[in-house]
C-alpha cells in the first residue's frame, strides 16, 4: 500500500510487513 511509509525494503516502525503488504499501526 503506497500510503504506508517504507524504510528501504521494510516498513517503517511501528508499522509491519505482512507478505508484500505493509500494515500501518
From Swiss-Prot:
Protein name: Conotoxin QcVIA
GO molecular function: toxin activity
Keywords on record: Disulfide bond, Hydroxylation, Knottin, Neurotoxin, Secreted, Toxin
Residues spanning the signal sequence: none
Keyword Ion transport assigned: no
Localization, UniProt: Secreted
Gene Ontology cellular-component terms listed: extracellular region
Chain positions found as 4-hydroxyproline: 5
Keyword Secreted set for record: yes
Top-level lineage group: Eukaryota
Amino acid at each position: 500500500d503506497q500510503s504506508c511509509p517504507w524504510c528501504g525494503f521494510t516498513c517503517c516502525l511501528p508499522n509491519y510487513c505482512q507478505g508484500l503488504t505493509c500494515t500501518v499501526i
